[in-house]
Curated annotation (Swiss-Prot):
Its EC number is 7.2.2.13. Residues 1-10, 29-39 have a biased composition (Basic and acidic residues). It comes from Catostomus commersonii (White sucker). It is a multi-pass membrane protein. GO terms for biological process: intracellular potassium ion homeostasis; intracellular sodium ion homeostasis; potassium ion import across plasma membrane; proton transmembrane transport; sodium ion export across plasma membrane. The active site is at 379 (4-aspartylphosphate intermediate). This is Sodium/potassium-transporting ATPase subunit alpha-1.
């Protein structure tokens, strides 16, 4: 296999077999890379190859590297080692989406129709009325203002790739033609021989060929918090788990390594995640689907009414032009002009309220999505847990002791009086390379930053808390020799000089490491400060303790020591750590210490609240199944008494395959098994198990899990903080990133950021989301109701030929004036009592606007409001001499400018000017009547099920809204000059009271309806009227 085969081979390695067949022939094909391909597991085989095979595959000399000329050829062939930026949406397109999307389109249609109607009138008459022109201008202004507002609020942009750019290391050290040289990381090519050292970012995916104590931090990729050892050994079939592959853009924490580049740029594992995250089609938010559904209903009603009356007016003998003007009038009267602004303001208010509770919302519509969430897929590390390893248990003196893992050290403490504990603490402090960073004297011990790996940091903090300064301990026992931890012997050892006055020895050897390895090196054990022989009974006791702590998902370390005899190791003896010249066998075992990343304090309560709100919480983690299961039990994701298949098998003492999976409510799925599951099998797991943990998952699998949940009809929220979470965050209905620990990439992909990294904040978000949905329903019910008293005058004007009871300008004053603040005030309404006790809404059946809401608003309350308006209208005209029978069919003469002697019911003659003043006074009175009946409507819309008396009148904004709409109506009626500007005339005080009985009727009618609802849950009234 010669050098020339390289291209085919590494394509296969980086992209999996299928994509190897479909080589990217040109840029277009490269862009349309099959997303399903990216979702598959990384299919590398380079970690299985011997060094000889590697040399053949890549044509690289393992000591001299590639030649410069060969590297240039490969660079020309493959392009730079960089991530391809995704196509971004230009800002003007985003602006246009706000201007012409969804609800705005309805208003634009209304505006265009108004201009059209004005144009028709202008062509027909010399002095056309300006009403339609005003209406068109106002509608356009409403859309433009709210569009700009939304655009500024919604600054969610596709910066995902920008933050990936920050992950690209700037420089790389390569060996070419036998010489080491620093080059720009973008120039690294497949087959390059690269050297990395502690502190470097890895410039591409490498196959390690030699290493020296090398550890890498893979947390941004796999979610594992512990640094991972890297060596030339092939240790696992899974390329993400094996020790001989280091990944692009992860960090080398310590040691050095040399490796051959096996993939660059978009073909690296990180590149695949980047392409996956930026290429995912993001679904629409539930609220945008709801608003579209609502627009369809409103448009449907408007067009149906418009066309019906167009035909009716033609039958009644009106001309075509008049009929079209009527059609336009009816359609425009149906458009709730103020609703777009109301919805935007409601969402913004909630977003601000959530920001105060540590939830930063990037996308306004995401506010509501969280409320409809039915499944939360949560990352473990840092979200459910504190993201700091902490000593949880010790085993010494033949018993397990529990340490305090609470964040504020408020838990129980163990007995520290034993001499064995003193020895154990000394070993943990001395055989430990972690140190506190400088200048942190005032910082509490648990919050201090440490240089060193997670386990050693946990030991350092534990000993500092329990025994005082570790630094002083180390100064007292000076270190004279050390063997650092390595993966072959799995222990770390150091020799220390005992301060003068030591017992029979001047030197103490201390060792820690994998418990079984440490125990094998011991002949005695310390119990109550005294050494005794290690017999089978104690070994069994050790084994039980080790299994118990391991079963809790904890990382267990063993500790032993040995006093080196003076006759063999006198003062000044030269200890040699390379060619070991001191004993490492027959030591004295002291004890075990186990560490875990403990759950956050508020999480169990939050998980409980999710459960009572009908939300399923699934844990998805890159960590080990045992640890994941232990934390899941600790926080209540797996509740007490619920068993997995393995638990049932252990209890009944039968093989796992004999247990019926449906008997187990809980289940822990290993990423390795998930790979082999079909979509149907995954769907079954998600459907039939109520409590699920996915462990050892890869980024692609997180995405597959989210898609599985969505297939089963769930609305999914995903929390995460690593780069590995970004595809899932982007795909979820709502992605929630961590503000403190989260990587830039995850924050860009998410819709919401938890500023305090606390899972409990999500529950607050869910409550706020449900509340906004409820309150938007109430707001829409309130706004739509006044549509009926706005439309019916127009219909009677056409059918009964009466003078127009309500003009276009007055309709605008209601929709954009008096109704605005009350509708927005409903966003401040407190939650009804059952908000976190009910199941998540079903997006298919529980709509924002459903038939029942339309029936209540239009068919019931709206009709009573229309009666109130007509009652006032007929009262005023009757007082002026026109009794109802006289009004029928009078319209043609009434609107004729040249008739100045029209007789009323009593024979008085009216000029055109006088008639119009009475007509405009009627418009004003009809308008004030709507305001008065809207008082009752606003109060009944406060609740959907509870009585207003139960809910109370605590919403100050709503009370202010009631006064504001009344004051505005009075101002428009009585302010001098309004008769010219808006054709609104002052009213007699008694005309205000005509609508009061109707307002009272609305209130009583609705209170009785809600009483029946509460008395007969699920009954006819609920089925027909509960919206």
């Amino acid at each position: 296999m010669g050098v020339g085969d390289g291209r085919d081979q590494y394509e296969l390695a980086a992209m999996s077999e299928q994509s190897g067949k479909k080589k990217s022939k040109n840029k277009k094909e490269k862009k349309e890379k099959d997303m399903d391909e990216l979702k598959k597991e990384v299919d590398l085989d380079d970690h299985k190859l011997s060094l000889e095979e590697l040399h053949h595959k890549y044509g690289t000399d393992l000591s001299k590297g590639l030649s410069n000329s060969r590297a240039e050829e490969i660079l020309a062939r493959d392009g730079p080692n960089a991530l391809t930026p995704p196509p971004t949406t230009p800002e003007w397109v985003k602006f246009c989406k706000q201007m012409f999307g969804g609800f705005s389109m309805l208003l634009w249609t209304g505006a265009v129709l108004c201009f059209l109607a004005y144009g028709i009138l202008a062509a027909m008459e010399d002095e056309p009325a300006n009403d339609n022109l005003y209406l068109g201008v106002v509608l356009s202004a409403v859309v433009i203002i709210t569009g700009c507002f939304s655009y500024y609020q919604d600054a969610k942009s596709s910066k995902i790739m920008d933050s990936f750019k920050n992950l690209v290391p700037q420089q790389a050290l390569v060996v070419r033609d036998g010489e080491k040289k620093q080059i720009n990381a973008e120039e690294v090519v497949i087959g390059d021989l690269v050297e990395v050292k502690g502190g470097d970012r890895i410039p591409a995916d490498l196959r390690i060929i030699s290493s020296h104590g090398c550890k890498v931090d893979n947390s941004s990729l796999t979610g594992e918090s512990e640094p991972q050892t890297r060596s030339p050994d092939f240790s696992n079939d899974n390329p993400l788990e094996t020790k001989n592959i280091a990944f692009f853009s992860t960090n080398c924490v310590e040691g050095t390594a040399r490796g051959i580049v096996i993939s660059t740029g978009d073909r690296t594992v990180m590149g695949r995640i980047a392409t996956l995250a930026s290429g995912l089609e993001v679904g629409r938010t539930p609220i945008s689907i709801e608003i579209e559904h609502f627009i369809h209903i409103i448009t449907g009603v408007a067009v149906f009414l418009g066309v019906s009356f167009l035909l009716l007016s033609l039958v009644l003998g009106y001309s075509w032009l008049e009929a079209v003007i009527f059609l336009i009038g009816i359609i425009v009267a149906n458009v709730p002009e103020g609703l777009l602004a109301t919805v935007t303001v409601c969402l913004t208010l909630t977003a601000k309220r959530m920001a105060k509770k540590n939830c930063l919302v990037k996308n306004l519509e995401a506010v509501e999505t969280l409320g409809s969430t039915s499944t939360i897929c949560s990352d473990k590390t840092g979200t459910l847990t504190q993201n700091r390893m902490t000593v949880a248990h010790m085993w010494f003196d033949n018993q397990i002791h529990e340490a305090d893992t609470t964040e504020n050290q408020s838990g129980t403490s163990f007995d520290r009086s034993s001499d064995t504990w003193a020895s154990l603490a000394r070993i943990a402090g001395l055989c430990n390379r972690a140190v506190f960073l400088a200048e942190q004297i005032d910082v509490p011990i648990l919050k201090r930053d440490v240089a060193g790996d997670a386990s050693e940091s946990a030991l350092l903090k534990c000993i500092e808390l329990c025994c005082g300064s570790v630094k002083e301990m180390r100064e007292k026992f000076t270190k004279v020799a050390e063997i650092p931890f390595n993966s072959t012997n799995k222990y770390q050892l150091s020799v220390h000089k005992i301060p003068s006055g030591g017992k029979e020895s001047q030197h103490l050897l201390v060792m820690k490491g994998a418990p079984e390895r440490i125990l094998d090196r011991c002949a005695t054990i310390m119990i109550q400060g005294k050494e005794q022989l290690l017999d089978d009974e104690i070994k069994e006791s050790f084994q039980n303790a080790y299994l118990e702590l391991g079963g809790l998902g904890e990382r267990v370390l063993g500790f032993c020591h040995f006093y080196l005899p003076d006759e063999q190791f006198p003062e000044g003896f030269q200890f040699d750590a390379d060619d070991v010249n001191f004993p490492t066998e027959n030591l004295c075992f002291v004890g075990l210490m186990s560490m875990i990343d403990p759950p956050r304090a508020a999480v169990p309560d939050a998980v409980g609240k999710c459960r009572s709100a009908g939300i399923k919480v699934i844990m998805v983690t890159g960590d080990h199944p045992i640890t994941a299961k232990a934390i899941a039990k600790g926080v209540g994701i797996i509740s007490e008494g619920n068993e997995t298949v393995e638990d049932i098998a252990a209890r009944l003492n039968i093989p796992v395959n004999e247990v019926n999976p449906r008997d187990a409510k809980a289940c822990v799925v290993h990423g390795g098994d998930l790979k082999d599951l079909s979509c149907e099998q995954l769907d079954d797991i998600l459907k039939y198990h109520t409590e699920i943990v996915f462990a050892r998952t890869s980024p692609q699998q997180k995405l597959i899990i989210v898609e599985g949940c969505q297939r089963t009809g769930a609305i999914v929220a995903v929390t995460g903080d690593g780069v590995n979470d970004s595809p899932a965050l982007k795909k979820a209905d709502i992605g929630v990133a961590m503000g403190i620990a989260g990587s830039d990439v995850s924050k860009q992909a998410a819709d919401m950021i938890l500023l305090d990294d606390n899972f409990a904040s999500i529950v607050t978000g869910v409550e706020e989301g449900r509340l906004i949905f409820d309150n938007l329903k109430k707001s829409i019910a309130y706004t739509l109701t006044s549509n009926i008293p706005e439309i019916t005058p127009f219909l009677f004007f056409i059918i009964a030929n009466i003078p127009l009871p309500l003009g276009t300008v007055t309709i605008l004053c209601i929709d954009l004036g008096t109704d605005m603040l009350p509708a927005i005030s409903l966003a401040y309404e407190a939650a009804e009592s059952d908000i976190m006790k009910r199941q998540p809404r079903n997006p298919k059946t529980d709509k924002l606007v459903n038939e029942r809401l339309i029936s209540i608003a239009y068919g019931q309350i709206g009709m009573i409001q229309a009666l109130a308006g007509f009652f006032t209208y007929f009262v005023i005209l009757a007082e002026n001499g026109f009794l109802p029978p006289r009004l029928l069919g009078i319209r043609m003469n009434w609107d004729d400018k040249y008739i100045n002697d029209l007789e009323d019911s009593y024979g008085q003659q009216w000029t055109y000017e006088q008639r119009k003043i009475v007509e405009f006074t009627c418009h004003t009175a009809f308008f004030t009547s709507i305001v008065i009946v809207q008082w009752a409507d606003l109060i009944i819309c406060k609740t959907r099920r509870n009585s207003v008396f139960q809910q109370g009148m605590k919403n100050k904004i709503l009370i202010f809204g009631l006064f504001e709409e009344t004051a505005l109506a009075a101002f428009l009626s009585y302010c001098p000059g309004m008769d010219v500007a808006l054709r609104m005339y002052p009213l007699k005080p008694n005309w205000w009271f005509c609508a009061f009985p109707y307002s009272l009727l609305i209130f009583i009618y609705d209170e009785i309806r809600k009483l029946i609802l509460r008395r007969n849950p699920g009954g006819w009234m609920e089925r027909e009227t509960y919206y």
